[in-house]
Amino acid sequence: MAQTMLLTANAKVDLRSKESLVERLKPKPLSSLFLPSLPLRFSSSTTNFSSSKFTSTTVALFKSKAKAPPKKVAPPKEKQKVEDGIFGTSGGIGFTKQNELFVGRVAMIGFAASLLGEAITGKGILAQLNLETGIPIYEAEPLLLFFILFNLLGAIGALGDRGRFIDDPAPATGLEKAVIPPGKSFKSALGLSEGGPLFGFTKANELFVGRLAQLGIAFSIIGEIITGKGALAQLNFETGVPINEIEPLLLFNIAFFFFAAINPGTGKFITDEEED
């Protein structure tokens, strides 16, 4: 009995320092690889001390995906508005600047021809067409009144002027302009535009001159209806003379209108659909 007690005393197991065999053989969870292991304590005081000393930290295996910044959406471009007529009737009857340019060219030729005819014959444009003149305006021919009204409204843009004219790209300068490609005409050798106008006349300038011609022919007809005199006679120009005796200023104006009508201006006509 005494020997048994001695063996038991000598074989005392230190449970605080070493884990038991059962604890070693237990399968350990995956979290024990990442979390710090806590020593096993049996006393309540030791357990409270160790829990307050060691705190468990959570380790994330996969980081959350960073959100991409929102894409900046560019504000929509404002659509350029086409020029309206003077009464806000832009294109109301399908009249565009290209149509107005054609009407202006016809008016330039007609106005120049009427001035030249009056200078040579001494008769105004209506007298040359054997129409009655020297009467009140309300007694004039209805077709003639419509022609006058059409020219006046077209000259001030009241018929509508959809679209616009844009200039051609700038020509080459410096060395590129000095080099003359083979097979070009005499205009290129002088540094002038090959296919465009001779003096840089644009379609916008041509449109303006056409409007002036429309105003001129309309007012000359109105004056001739009322007074019975042509446009030159109203301005006290000498008429009924040979062409070589016509005033130089008058000849210059006639030649200018003829030249502006037949010489194509630079630039091109675009509409809203072509801009889009």
From Swiss-Prot:
- Which GO cellular component does the record give, naming just one? chloroplast thylakoid membrane
**Pfam family example for this protein?**
Chloroa_b-bind
| GO-annotated biological processes | photosynthesis
Highest taxon of source: Eukaryota
Q: What is the official name of this protein in its record?
A: Photosystem II 22 kDa protein, chloroplastic
Give the location in the cell: Plastid, Chloroplast thylakoid membrane
Q: How does it sit in the membrane?
A: Multi-pass membrane protein
The intrachain disulfides are none
**Role this protein plays:** Seems to be involved in non-photochemical quenching, a process maintains the balance between dissipation and utilization of light energy to minimize generation of oxidizing molecules, thereby protecting the plant against photo-oxidative damage.
Q: Which residues cross the membrane?
A: 106-126, 140-160, 207-227, 242-262
Per the similarity annotation, which family is this? Belongs to the ELIP/psbS family.
User: Source species, please?
Assistant: Solanum sogarandinum
The annotated transit peptide is positioned at 1-67
- Keyword entries, A-Z: Chloroplast, Membrane, Photosynthesis, Photosystem II, Plastid, Repeat, Thylakoid, Transit peptide, Transmembrane, Transmembrane helix
